[in-house]
Amino acid sequence: MADSSRGFVRDARGCRHWGPHGAAGLLLLRGPDLLLQRRSWRVHHGRTWSIPGGALDAGESPWDGARREFAEELGGLPVLRHLHTFVDDHGGWAYHTVVAEALEPFRPRRGDGEAAAHRWCSPAEVAGLRLHPGFAATWPDLAAGLDGLDGLDGLDGLGRRG
């Protein structure tokens, strides 16, 4: 039986995306820093930086999907506090960026091979990286949206402490 949660689909604008039920990723915060992963050369948009994430399964919530993908790609999952979910709606397809705070130390391990590397970085460093096109397009809005989230007061629109 075919897995209905996999494959490319087109949104209302004709853009191609992975996952007919949408996708979700986890933007993990540790104090002022966030965790990014460099995608393996073997995956779509390889060798770019993004957050762990992927296609949602049928009926799966963005929170559950983001945590599942994070654990698969980075070999584990810390205890989390959900802060917010940003939705990038493309019309017929959406990407959900789940923002969460790590409530315990977390050290990524080798996961399913989709991540070639990972790093903690300040929000100000993000724009200087070679980003996944979808993440690059939403990063300015995400960075601005981080300002004022519970526990993150004092970040300016670029995600820097003011």
Language-model features, listed with the residues they occupy:
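Compositionally biased, intrinsically disordered low-complexity segments enriched
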Residues: G145-R160
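Acidic, metal-coordinating catalytic segment for phosphate/diphosphate chemistry
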Residues: M1-G25
